[in-house]
Curated annotation (Swiss-Prot):
It holds the Pfam family LRRCT. GO terms for biological process: aortic valve morphogenesis; apoptotic process involved in luteolysis; axon extension involved in axon guidance; axon guidance; branching morphogenesis of an epithelial tube; cell migration involved in sprouting angiogenesis; cellular response to heparin; cellular response to hormone stimulus. The gene is SLIT2. It comes from the Eukaryota. This is Slit homolog 2 protein. It comes from Homo sapiens (Human).
């Protein structure tokens, strides 16, 4: 019975507890807000899903955080959850089963994350899910069972991913699908049954993919035509002839496959192995692939993964946990700075973990927990500054531990105790502090001599650089004299090092010394997040703080005692800003912009003793200003604007001993009467605060004023502490709504309440968005319409996280900076209507996730490809009502932003500089006279003028001589007393007021013999008649003298009174007998013969069968009979023809002989080709002659022998012959002539015993005589022509110094060996050798590569986009036959074009005349072009070498520094230097007939890289000095 009673009691207690649990409200997760069944945790920077989410939650908002991983326990038990928001996180991994408990889930948003893949059967338990958003991730493939179980999905969004593969049947379960978006992916093919089972599909997007329209995609065309309202703008991207065609418009016969292809379902290899990696034998190799994160699609059976030499920074939670069989992980040489504590959880088989060469500073707690099999752990070359005492507690089998080259100063005792199997340890290159806390390590290393790297002490000085294992343990001591690095904190930090409390890292931009953290003078506007916990003094003075926010930062600083906020711009302190700062006893807020003081500002400062509020803008001290500051002893309010102090203002300051109220404009009226008596009683005030009002009490100490004189008579009843002053005088206020419309305001009025929610500033004269607006965090509406705002900044609306409505319409906005609207995640309405905006940069609205209405009409939008994103953005949820229209370019004018197809937004040529200048006004070069242009938020742009000029555009000289009014080198002098007066002293040869007149020196000249005088500058020149010469034309010429005789072709020169005449030889005419008279003009050739001119005669070339001097004899009549060719056998494809009754063979290129039986010329087109001549052909005395043609610089021509050899090759365009008869080094000779010009050259080689003779084109021979020893040349070896085999026994040439060993590339013909013409058909021939010679000359193929051919001489392999025999015709050029009348054709794509009209013409075909005013018509630029400034003003942009308003002045000779690649042609390849070369270009003019040119240059060697993959080193001549020198014709 007793047992039954206890059972009943236990059952009753269980029921009671269950009921209490059901009734009691569940706790809300920390930082989140809960209302009913809704839990809101958005925008909290969470890195993981919070714990303890109430089980009854129906809606969970986790968007806008930093979550990286979803585990299968995160949402366990949430069986009532219907809506889950996970967008805008950093999720890269979702464990299988993560959503298995979410049986009621209806909507799931995972868009804007980092997902690359997701596991199959992920949604198996979510049968009620009807909306799933996976857009804007990095998903690469869709597995076959991706959506298995989620049969009720109606809306599935997969757009803007990287999907390239969809496994067959992936969508088979989604029979009720209504909306499917697959646009903007990398899809190339889809299986035929992909969408057939979706009868309810009403929205389907597939555009912006890489669809390949071959026979396997023909089904999609029919499918789309049957459903004309879905799949709009779906286009082919291949093959090339269908690129850009709508799939639905392509006919079935056009979907063709090349060859016999059979469709194979897309093989989604990326699902089983990362795209950048290789997978085999359970090993995944991702070394050096540029990865930035751990791949998620790894095979579950892997045993080893290699991730070294990438740029991975973070190891997320559970990164390797799914791969239970892992034995080795290599993460070395990355940039890892963050490791999740459970990154390696569950890897019980892991025996090697390599983490060296990263940026790890701390090992998280439990990082190596459960790694019982680990034997090798490499942590060297990191920045580890602390080891927890239990860091290695489970590593019982570890053999080798490397902590070499880190930042360890101490190690807690017991850290290495669990390492029972340790054999080797590396601790060197750490800054160890060898005090008493490290004594244990010395004892440990004495007992276990396993440290092999030589770990040494860094401090104290007496132990510096000594090996820890060799120091006696008694030397490790702590004393008051030995405090290192941070005085007073060493011992404290060392003791806690086992818990990694010694947070040594100093915040970025700050300086840490002792317990002081100095972050002053760094332009900070927020308190750094990671401040060391040992901080006692925090210096934040001289920064850019405007509001002190309640971030809870001081809760983490238990040692903090002093904070310095002086010299900032602080206007407000949020309630709770100092929460947790209970130990702080001194705060400096001197020189800020505080206007009032409230007790909530200082909440949490229970121990504060000193409060400095000097030099602020405080106007009132209320009786609640200092509540809670009972410990304050010193309070300074010096130099503020205090006029009133409320009675009892200092009563709560029980410990106050010093109060400074000096330098304040106190109004001694009735409201201040109490203060005089209080000052007399307390006697704690520094100095004597004085009255400033009323006038009769000015400068009277307050404590000396009689009580009856503190009156509010004569209207002096101002009270700065009155609550009525909470509304500016220019505005009207109702609750939290402030209206300041149409008040002519230029700055924000003072006194706007901090809790204002709606602020109306429309109809004023603001030119900028007031910076002070960022202080009003509760604003939900701002109206700044109808002002003069011309620019916005990236900080214009910072801190306005609650803003719902922003109206900026009817201003002068020209540019939207990319980050102007960052942080406005609650904004629902944005009005930019009626401005001058042309372009909105992509990403400008990224944070406007809640925006439902955008007004951007009445703006001159320039709708090219840079605005396509905005069109897509407004179309996505119809956020723009269809008012905004495009103003250009071209055909886009007047098109609606909302309805115009995205493909119409294209870029066609350069954008007008006036449009670009809206966001960068300096592009239009508005600053004249070398002024420097800078953007300015108020004046749009501002010019910094050089000396001598002023004005907005630096176009106004400060005095008359600045603009050099004296021409032609005249000297300008100012007239005293006249601002614009000047006079000129002219250079010789000029006169006039501005030296503009060149004196006519021909008025008194000495030119003789009727010569013509030509005026110069201070001189003149005589132009002589033909028969005279000399400076003054005083000498008569003898034209018939031998050195002057102009008569050509042996004609006779005869002197005449007027000069000379030529008596021509027969056949020549002309003044100088230089013209060969065309005797064919009156020829007697008959029967269609061709006349060929000759000197003093002509020749008739007769048609076939005709003969005679004038081809007058007809061919004899031939009776039908058998052709002579019938029995004449032409060889090698030659054609037999009959000529004069005789059969003749017309040989193909390369062949000759009576029957074309010999192959005598060949073309080497392969770098590995060669001919092999039998050894019997070559004897000790041999004469070899051949003809070659090439434009290459190098290549083997002839080679015979093994180690001792005769070799003839091309070397830098010359013929190089070497003869190695056994002496070393081998002798060599070079031809004087270069032969790589593409023409044929004769090379003759004569070998006689131990001498070798070389001759080119019949020139003087070069001879080698090598008599050092008897020749060992092997005459039994063959003779190789044009190359040689790459075997070791004939590789001496390839290895010889100065020789390249590459095969010949070009033509060889008429090879004679000992006067015997060689037939190449009879010798072994490699592939890549063609009969006939037609060498490829440079640039014969305009846009392609020349390849020799035996049939046509050569063929051109054209580049993409070009066609024709010489690659000089464009393919699919829509501009061929265009109809542009007064304009230029610009191709849009392969099928259409647009016309860019000339000035004064318009219309689609530029066939309409326009009468447009062009400001550039008013000025003429002599040596330059007219441009428009940012304000629309015309100016001249001068060509190089000229200056002046009209570009009419030539700049004197000077060298202009340029830095660019140096280019040259090398054979068939274009080559350029591997780096840019700095050199001078000489520009400008010179006087005295000289030219501007180089005076000094130098030669330097540079490396060149060529388009064919080759490289070489060559010299380049660089100009280093320019000046005036003799002109070179």
């Amino acid at each position: 019975m007793r047992g039954v009673g206890w059972q009943m009691l236990s059952l009753s207690l269980g029921l009671v507890l269950a009921i209490l649990n059901k009734v009691a409200p569940q706790a809300c997760p920390a930082q989140c807000s809960c209302s009913g069944s809704t839990v809101d945790c958005h925008g909290l920077a969470l890195r993981s899903v919070p714990r303890n989410i109430p089980r009854n939650t129906e809606r969970l908002d986790l968007n806008g955080n930093n979550i990286t991983r979803i585990t299968k326990t995160d949402f366990a038990g949430l069986r009532h959850l219907r809506v889950l928001q996970l967008m805008e996180n950093k999720i890269s991994t979702i464990e299988r089963g993560a959503f298995q408990d979410l049986k009621e889930l209806e909507r799931l948003r995972l868009n804007r994350n980092h997902l690359q893949l997701f596991p199959e059967l992920l949604f198996l338990g979510t049968a009620k899910l009807y909306r799933l958003d996976l857009s804007e991730n990095q998903i690469q493939a869709i597995p076959r069972k991706a959506f298995r179980g989620a049969v009720d999905i109606k809306n599935l969004q997969l757009d803007y991913n990287q999907i390239s593969c969809i496994e067959d049947g992936a969508f088979r379960a989604l029979r009720d699908l209504e909306v499917l978006t697959l646009n903007n992916n990398n899809i190339t093919r889809l299986s035929v049954a992909s969408f057939n089972h979706m009868p309810k599909l009403r929205t389907f997007r597939l555009h912006s993919n890489n669809l390949y329209c071959d026979c396997h995609l023909a089904w999609l065309s029919d499918w789309l035509r049957q459903r004309p309202r879905v799949g709009l703008y779906t286009q082919c991207m291949g093959p090339s002839h269908l690129r850009g065609h709508n799939v639905a418009e392509v006919q079935k016969r056009e979907f063709v496959c090349s060859g016999h292809q059979s469709f194979m379902a897309p093989s989604c290899s990326v699902l089983h192995c990362p795209a950048a990696c290789t997978c085999s034998n359970n090993i995944v190799d991702c070394r050096g692939k540029g990865l930035t994160e751990i791949p998620t699609n790894l095979p579950e059976t892997i045993t080893e993964i290699r991730l070294e030499q990438n740029t991975i920074k973070v190891i997320p939670p559970g990164a390797f946990s799914p791969y239970k069989k892992l034995r080795r992980i290599d993460l070395s040489n990355n940039q890892i700075s963050e490791l999740a504590p459970d990154a390696f959880q569950g890897l019980r088989s892991l025996n090697s973990l390599v983490l060296y060469g990263n940026k790890i500073t701390e090992l998280p707690k439990s990082l190596f927990e459960g790694l019982f099999s680990l034997q090798l752990l490499l942590l060297n070359a990191n920045k580890i500054n602390c080891l927890r005492v239990d860091a290695f507690q489970d590593l019982h089998n570890l053999n080798l531990l490397s902590l070499y080259d880190n930042k360890l100063q101490t190690i807690a005792k017991g850290t290495f105790s669990p390492l029972r199997a340790i054999q080797t340890m590396h601790l060197a290159q750490n800054p160890f502090i060898c005090d008493c806390h490290l004594k244990w390590l010395a004892d440990y290393l004495h007992t276990n001599p396993i440290e092999t790297s030589g770990a040494r002490c860094t401090s104290p000085r007496r132990l510096a650089n000594k090996r820890i294992g060799q120091i006696k343990s008694k030397k490790f001591r702590c004393s008051a004299k030995e405090q290192y690095f941070i005085p007073g904190t060493e011992d404290y930090r060392s003791k806690l090092s086992g818990d990694c409390f010694a947070d040594l890292a100093c915040p970025e931009k700050c300086r840490c010394e002792g317990t002081t953290v100095d972050c002053s003078n760094q332009k900070l506007n927020k308190i750094p997040e990671h401040i060391p916990q040992y901080t006692a003094e925090l210096r934040l003075n001289n920064n850019e703080f405007t509001v002190l926010e309640a971030t809870g930062i001081f809760k983490k600083l238990p040692q903090l005692r002093k904070i310095n906020f002086s010299n900032n711009k602080i206007t407000d302190i949020e309630e709770g800003a100092f929460e947790g700062a209970s130990g702080v006893n001194e705060i400096l807020l001197t020189s800020n912009r505080l206007e009032n003081v409230q007790h909530k500002m200082f909440k949490g400062l229970e121990s504060l003793k000193t409060l400095m509020l000097r030099s602020n803008r405080i106007t009132c001290v209320g009786n609640d200003s200092f509540i809670g500051l009972s410990s304050v002893r010193l309070l300074s309010l010096y130099d503020n604007q205090i006029t009133t102090v409320a009675p009892g203002a200092f009563d709560t300051l029980h410990s106050l001993s010093t109060l400074n109220l000096l330098a304040n404009p106190f109004n001694c009226n009735c409201y201040l009467a109490w203060l005089g008596e209080w000052l007399r009683k307390k006697r704690i005030v520094t100095g004597n605060p004085r009255c400033q009002k009323p006038y009769f009490l000015k400068e009277i100490p307050i404590q000396d004023v009689a009580i009856q004189d503190f009156t509010c008579d004569d209207g002096n009843d101002d009270n700065s502490c009155s609550p009525l002053s909470r509304c500016p005088t220019e505005c009207t206020c109702l609750d939290t709504v402030v209206r300041c419309s149409n008040k002519g305001l230029k700055v924000l009025p003072k006194g706007i309440p901090r809790d204002v929610t709606e602020l109306y500033l429309d109809g004023n004269q603001f030119t900028l968005v007031p910076k002070e607006l960022s202080n009003y965090k509760h604003l939900t509406l701002i109206d700044l319409s109808n002002n003069r705002i011309s620019t916005l900044s990236n900080q214009s609306f910072s801190n306005m996280t609650q803003l719902l409505t922003l109206i900026l319409s009817y201003n002068r906005l020209r540019c939207i900076p990319p980050r102007t609207f960052d942080g406005l995640k609650s904004l629902r309405l944005l009005s930019l209507h009626g401005n001058d905006i042309s372009v909105v940069p992509e990403g400008a609205f990224n944070d406007l996730s809640a925006l439902s209405h955008l007004a951007i009409g009445a703006n001159p939008l320039y709708c090219d490809c840079n605005m396509q994103w905005l069109s897509d953005w407004v179309k996505s949820e119809y956020k723009e009502p269809g008012i905004a229209r495009c103003a250009g370019p071209g055909e886009m004018a007047d098109k609606l932003l909302l309805t115009t197809p995205s493909k119409k937004f294209t870029c066609q040529g350069p954008v007008d500089v006036n449009i670009l200048a809206k966001c960068n006004p300096c592009l239009s070069n508005p600053c004249k006279n070398d002024g420097t242009c800078n953007s300015d938020p108020v004046d749009f742009y501002r010019c910094t003028c050089p000396y001598g000029f002023k004005g907005q555009d630096c176009d106004v000289p400060i005095h008359a001589c600045i603009s050099n009014p004296c021409k032609h080198g005249g000297t300008c002098h100012l007239k005293e007393g006249e601002e614009d007066g000047f006079w000129c002293i002219c250079a010789d040869g000029f006169e006039g007021e501005n030296c503009e007149v060149n004196v006519d020196d021909c008025e008194d000249n000495d030119c003789e013999n009727n010569s013509t005088c030509v005026d110069g500058i201070n001189n003149y020149t005589c132009l002589c008649p033909p028969e005279y010469t000399g400076e003054l034309c005083e000498e008569k010429l003898d034209f018939c003298a031998q050195d002057l005789n102009p008569c050509q072709h042996d004609s006779k020169c005869i002197l005449t009174p007027k000069g000379f005449k030529c008596d021509c030889t027969p056949g020549y005419v002309g003044e100088h007998c230089d013209i060969d008279f065309d005797d064919c003009q009156d020829n007697k050739c008959k029967n269609g013969a061709h006349c060929t001119d000759a000197v003093n005669g002509y020749t008739c070339i007769c048609p076939e069968g005709y003969s005679g001097l004038f081809c007058e004899f007809s061919p004899p009549m031939v009776l039908p009979r058998t052709s002579p060719c019938d029995n004449f056998d032409c060889q090698n494809g030659a054609q037999c023809i009959v000529r004069i009754n005789e059969p003749i063979c017309q040989c193909l290129p390369g062949y000759q002989g009576e029957k074309c039986e010999k192959l005598v010329s060949v073309n080497f087109i392969n770098k590995e080709s060669y001919l092999q001549i039998p050894s019997a052909k070559v004897r000790p005395q041999t004469n070899i002659t051949l003809q070659i043609a090439t434009d290459e610089d190098s290549g083997i021509l002839l080679y015979k022998g093994d180690k001792d050899h005769i070799a003839v090759e091309l070397y830098r365009g010359r013929v190089r012959a070497s003869y190695d008869t056994g002496s070393h080094p081998a002798s060599a000779i070079y031809s004087v002539e270069t032969i790589n010009d593409g023409n044929f050259h004769i090379v003759e080689l004569l070998a006689l015993d131990q001498s070798l003779s070389l001759s080119v084109d019949g020139g003087n021979p070069k001879i080698i005589t090598n008599l050092s020893k008897q020749s060992t040349l092997n005459f039994d070896s063959p003779l190789y022509v044009g190359g040689m085999p790459g075997k070791s026994n004939v590789a001496s040439l390839r290895q010889a110094p100065g020789q390249n060993g590459t095969s010949f590339h070009g033509c060889i013909r008429n090879l004679y060996i000992n006067s015997e013409l060689q037939d190449f058909q009879k010798v072994p021939m490699q592939t890549g050798i063609l009969p006939g010679c037609e060498p490829c000359h440079k640039k014969v193929c305009a846009h392609g590569t020349c390849q020799p051919s035996s049939q046509a001489g050569f063929t051109c392999e054209c580049q993409e986009g070009w066609m024709g025999p010489l690659c000089d015709q464009r393919t699919n050029d829509p501009c061929l036959g265009n109809k542009c009348v007064h304009g230029t054709c610009l191709p849009i794509n392969a099928f259409s074009y647009s016309c860019k009209c000339l000035e004064g013409h318009g219309g689609v075909l530029c066939d309409e005349e326009e009468d447009l005013f062009n400001p550039c018509q008013a000025i003429k630029c002599k040596h330059g072009k007219c441009r428009l400034s940012g304000l629309g003003q015309p100016y001249c942009e001068c060509s190089s070498g000229y200056t002046g308003d009209s570009c009419d002045r030539e700049i004197s000779c000077r060298g202009e520094r340029i830095r660019d690649y140096y280019q040259k042609q090398q054979g068939y390849a274009a080559c350029q230097t591997t780096k840019k070369v700095s050199r001078l270009e000489c520009r400008g003019g010179c006087a005295g007939g000289q030219c501007c040119g180089p005076l000094r240059s130098k030669r330097r060697k540079y490396s060149f890289e060529c388009t064919d993959g080759s490289s070489f080193v060559d010299e380049v001549e660089k100009v280093v000095k320019c000046g005036c020198t003799r002109c070179v014709s």
